[in-house]
């Protein structure tokens, strides 16, 4: 039995979010939370909320024991990109891509 939580279109690039995702993959849920609380990155705050949601889903929807939960999968995919322009000199404009991500955590009982 597995429990999952997903959040879509978060304003962080997938590349930066994957740095934090790699820290918690295959760890127990409690260990992953302690790692995230001690990681000073914007993505760690997003993953804390997501992991708490996945644990709550496991307990409430599937009746799992939260002491035995392990992070089975952490997926970080690219979302839609917001395209903006930065005015430059002599009438030029540079493109700015504000990237978004889709985040997903899958928990499994050990």
From Swiss-Prot:
SUPFAM superfamilies (alphabetical): Ribosomal protein L22
InterPro entries given in the database record: Ribosomal_uL22 (IPR001063), Ribosomal_uL22_bac/chlpt-type (IPR005727), Ribosomal_uL22_bac/org-type (IPR047867), Ribosomal_uL22_CS (IPR018260), Ribosomal_uL22_sf (IPR036394)
GO biological process, one term: translation
Domain of life: Bacteria
Single GO term (MF): structural constituent of ribosome
The protein's assembly and partners: Part of the 50S ribosomal subunit.
PANTHER family reported for this sequence: CHLOROPLAST 50S RIBOSOMAL PROTEIN L22-RELATED, LARGE RIBOSOMAL SUBUNIT PROTEIN UL22M
Family: Belongs to the universal ribosomal protein uL22 family.
Function: This protein binds specifically to 23S rRNA; its binding is stimulated by other ribosomal proteins, e.g. L4, L17, and L20. It is important during the early stages of 50S assembly. It makes multiple contacts with different domains of the 23S rRNA in the assembled 50S subunit and ribosome. The globular domain of the protein is located near the polypeptide exit tunnel on the outside of the subunit, while an extended beta-hairpin is found that lines the wall of the exit tunnel in the center of the 70S ribosome.
Protein name: Large ribosomal subunit protein uL22
Gene label: rplV
